[in-house]
Amino acid sequence: MEHQTTPKQKTKEKSKGNKTKFVGVRQRPSGKWVAEIKDTTQKIRMWLGTFETAEEAARAYDEAACLLRGSNTRTNFANHFPNNSQLSLKIRNLLHQKQSMKQQQQQQHKPVSSLTDCNINYISTATSLTTTTTTTTTTAIPLNNVYRPDSSVIGQPETEGLQLPYSWPLVSGFNHQIPLAQAGGETHGHLNDHYSTDQHLGLAEIERQISASLYAMNGANSYYDNMNAEYAIFDPTDPIWDLPSLSQLFCPT
């Protein structure tokens, strides 16, 4: 009695014949063998090609595994493979593309951080400029051969005495450091004295000179303030520097 095989048994026998002991190798329905390698660490899945025999496909897998994972990886054969084969060049190009894509992704995140750094630098620079502007004072510096005197030299007249801050000459014989209270007291005292007419006239002349000096000084202060507010520059060619002395104004010859 002959043993007859059913179609299911034939399919099982065929599938058992298709199974191989090689890693990364499988057979197509057409009968050819294909090799494929996966690397979850580097996120690579590479099609190695179609081969006539299972041994050729297994050797292609071994070569790709050694290039991707190193020589200690699991292989189908213990043989060493050349590094200049067409498959090795293909795998190296794939690795280079993966590294380039990774670098591009990292560079895409850099502009955001650089813009943030620029904004921080701009804010800190603006703050430092504001602080520098608020602490800046007027000083006497030469610029383009034009001397700009320090505005701090110009001050208000003292109340205790008539010590003028300017070097303008006054009338000869005039004591410009006489206190106002003393001058006023002497004035009232001499007004009550009918026998000191000459002294009264002398004090009146002194008071007139004091009034003229104060008027000239106040006018100069107003002029300096206007110059500081509008131009902040003292020009040596300005007519203010050519003013005649008070002795020439009040005692013309």
From Swiss-Prot:
Residues 21-78 bind DNA. It comes from the Eukaryota. Its main location: nucleus. One of its GO terms (cellular component) is nucleus. SMART domains: AP2. Gene3D superfamilies: AP2/ERF domain. GO terms for molecular function: DNA-binding transcription factor activity; sequence-specific DNA binding. GO terms for biological process: cellular response to potassium ion; ethylene-activated signaling pathway; post-embryonic root development; response to ethylene; response to reactive oxygen species. Disulfide bonds: none annotated. Keywords: Activator, DNA-binding, Ethylene signaling pathway, Nucleus, Transcription, Transcription regulation. It is found in: Nucleus. Probably acts as a transcriptional activator. Binds to the GCC-box pathogenesis-related promoter element. May be involved in the regulation of gene expression by stress factors and by components of stress signal transduction pathways. Belongs to the AP2/ERF transcription factor family. ERF subfamily. PANTHER family: ETHYLENE-RESPONSIVE TRANSCRIPTION FACTOR RAP2-11 (PTHR31194:SF90), SHN SHINE , DNA BINDING / TRANSCRIPTION FACTOR (PTHR31194). This is Ethylene-responsive transcription factor RAP2-11. It comes from Arabidopsis thaliana (Mouse-ear cress). The lineage of its organism: Eukaryota, Viridiplantae, Streptophyta, Embryophyta, Tracheophyta. The gene is RAP2-11.
